């Protein structure tokens, strides 16, 4: 946080200085990428995504790529005439993927450890608009070189109806590993 107690923007602040491009290019901050460390994670910090409408074409493309041909997501006739919602659903895997992708920070020091408590709370239909709120829930030292951070993802549709919830565990590099030498779990 800065002196005004506001969260500072971390997108593109520093470069990762790649060695396989000209120096003058490598010095330019990387767009849509972050380089925060474990020590920089603020428990309670939230971000909200832009909204995103899910179209029929992309829903069918996602279904085909994932081989999800369930009648609720791929059969208009079934969904309309025999299904309990009278219209086609967006695949839950797509809502999960899009929901998390909307707030992906592309941090070069963070690595996915897994997901907990994934719940599909309400259906999402073709043409619905979704957005996501991500919250840093907790962090704890875990390994010699990185700690574990738990974040929640809440995906909403329309004017704030929650449709998906999950918690993401990710390991994040320490800026100063020596500060955690007596705090992480020993094997």
Segments the model singles out, each with a brief description of its role:
Residues 117-122, 168-173, 180-184:
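A structural preference for long, well-packed, hydrophobic secondary-structure segments
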Residues 3-7, 151-174:
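Short peripheral tails and domain-boundary helices/loops at the edges of structured domains
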Residues 114-158:
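Hydrophobic beta-sheet segments that form the core/acyl-binding groove
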Residues 36, 42-49, 129-131, 148-150, ...:
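Intrinsic-disorder/low-complexity, polar/charged segments enriched in Ser/Thr/Lys/Arg/Asp/Glu/Gln
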Residues 55, 138-139, 170-172:
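A short acidic/small-residue loop/turn micro-motif
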Residues 2-113, 175-187:
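Hot-dog-fold acyl-thioester-processing enzymes
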